[in-house]
Amino acid sequence: MHIFIFNNASRAANYGIGTYVRLLSDGLLGRSGVKVSFVDMFSDVKEYSIADDERGCRHYQVPALFSGMENEPYCRNVFYFLARHIKAEDDERLVFHFNYFQHKPLASLLKGQYFDCRIVFTVHYLGWCFELKGNKTRFRELIAEGYQPKDDKERGLLAGVENEKEFLHLADEVIVLSKDTQQILAEGYGVSSDKMHLVYNGLGDGLCFDKDKNVGNGRIILFVGRLDEIKGLNYLIHAFRHIADKYADIRLVVAGDGDFQLYLSQCRDLQGRVSFLGKVSSSEVEDVYRSAYIGVMPSFHEQCSYTAIEMMRHKIPLIGTDTTGLAEMLDATPELRVSIDEDNMMDEEFTERLVSCLNLLLSDEDAYQRAADAVGKLYEARYKVSDMVHATCGVMESSWDRPDYTVSPDYLKHIDSRMIQLINQCPDIDTDFYGMGGIGVYLWKRVLDLCDRKEGDFQASLILEHLIYYMDWVQDVVGSSPLPVELWAMIRSMGQHGFYKTCVNALLVRQSGSDTLFQMPSDRVIINVVLNVFR
């Protein structure tokens, strides 16, 4: 199995996604029969290049374009670069592992080029979570049937959801990092449950903590993360201010980069009690965690935070919110889970809840120790890197176990829409099976399949309506020229089912060899053809 991992040399690559890619690839390299290569998008190189790293992994390096980092032309150029160099052996199983929604055009092209490959997508984020600060109630309102967006912001958000949905439907396997995301994708994105796999992020393979933590220099309350509004640091600063006089030995340490000025101004009355470390290097981060007494993540959105896992691994009691994926990371310590009221968020009430959790851990040593032990046990049960690698590799390997598999059933409606769009456009394309013929053969085969399932009635009716336009298009273009055998087989099948008799019968009469029988191509051949029509 040859796994191509797609990554970005971007800000996110220096945070959670970059950590995930590094740990996953390190683990996969130790597995028998697995080869790992990287496609490094937006790389700091001047031209397309190929290089091997010290581990023997091949890197396909793609330079940045100032005109747009990941727009469709950029992805198409990357595809042509990869198609020249990736040559699949007859028995080699190819996995293209994506981590960014912006790469959807590239994934679609690769699926058409390497039909037997598997597209695996790991969901590290959902765009609307940043815009709506993880508010699932508001998200459900926006995607409700019949909802009309009120402004450009809402229209842009919904367009982003549709883009994410198409990629998730295209993917053969979808890896989610939390149960919460699994539910959102099932209910809000229509992703089939049989291709979704819950695999928690993993870090290390054992606890890493001091049994006798030295708090002689004071008890440190630690925040680690980007200095973005969605991380909720301002609430933590307000909460710290409430308790600073009560506990003279506590300090707040903030590790991460971003807009320092905004938060420094909030700490003017806390001089000497709050420290901003900036972005901490990998060589220093261990000391930061070892010195921490309590961790706080007042975030409005997380998937499966490596910061939270690192705190668990060091047996640091963690105070967090009940938002998205963070809630289940606090399963072992529900008393430290701070509720976010999505319908009526009150800043003061939220701050008071943070204060209550901080007071519990700072004033009750037994409660503190119970929480420390609980998070350590949860880490060992759920968040070890060996478990993550084993489960992810299992998802990829088992993807070939489905008999007669061609493409994700979720994706068929998107193919339908693309074929219908081509019918409406009537482009100047060849009439053979790899052009006009493939469009009709695919849609007619879809109708036959949908008619066998009651839930497919609406979609079948939509396709049949456009097949009428399609047959008129064929009649205009083909004239008396011989029909491709695949198109001929489709028209014969239409005649047998009594579809659009006037046009179909006219074509049957006009075509020579009407007594010759041809078989419709197999599903595998048809899907392969229409995926390439997408190009």
Spans of features found by a protein language model:
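Nucleotide-activated donor-binding/catalytic signature segment of Leloir-type glycosyltransferases, i.e.
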Residues: 264-283
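Aromatic "clamp/platform" in nucleotide-sugar-dependent glycosyltransferases that forms part
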Residues: 300
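Membrane-proximal helix-turn-helix segments that form the acceptor-binding/catalytic region
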Residues: 127, 142-174
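Conserved donor-binding/catalytic core segment of Leloir-type glycosyltransferases
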Residues: 175, 214-231, 237-240, 253
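Short alpha-helical donor nucleotide-sugar binding micro-motif in glycosyltransferases
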Residues: 279, 287-292
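Short hydrophobic beta-strand element within catalytic cores of glycosyltransferases
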Residues: 317-320, 327
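Carbohydrate-associated surface elements
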Residues: 180, 202
